[in-house]
Amino acid sequence: MSTFRLTAMTAFMVSSLFLVGCATENSRAVQVAKVDSAIGTFNGVRYPVSIGKFDNRSSFMRGVFSDGVDRLGSQAKTTLISHLQQSQRFSVLDRDNMSEISQEAKLQGKTQTIRGASYVVTGDISEFGRKEVGDQQLFGLLGRGKTQVAYAKITLNVVNSLTSEVVYSARGAGEYELSNREVLGFGGTASYDATLNGKVLDLAMREAVNRLVEAKDAGQWGQEVAR
């Protein structure tokens, strides 16, 4: 083997080891937003509620090529349960895992004491959409930019479980934007960010739950079953 080839191979191996040695891994915890009423302590009565049907009524992910699985509605329902529980105003009763819960009670050799809900909270995603807005400077030579926008609107209905009366309705809406700009070849435009779907859905849900809690605290609903 020639001296030149040996030197080249050695340099390649050294550079490879250098690149591997420079690999870094970073992680950080991200603060999760909560509804307004989650802050502080609430000493009042928590109303028992269960969650009814929650569907995606928007045209998003409901086209001819959809597999029929309502993932957006399922995600919204999970988010609703979390925010209602964190609001400190409701005792949320799980109705989606009844068989699993029953099995665990049997394993403990105990009889279940399932609690009934005074209200059933139902709702839907009435509006949901994504769009991209772009611009260019001097036909893109000086720079270009792209903004991804996600919008969602949530509707919640509170139903009296004894009378089936809708005692209160609340709505919440939110919009998220992600912008990137490239100037004279520096910077870049981000690809499609699917996390915006969850972020804007969570934002709209928080707004709807905030309105629900505010109305309850103001006595606009809930008095008929207050104990």
Which ranges hold each PLM region?
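A generic local secondary-structure boundary/capping motif
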Residues: 38-40, 111, 143-146
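Bacterial N-terminal signal peptides that target proteins for export
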Residues: 1-11
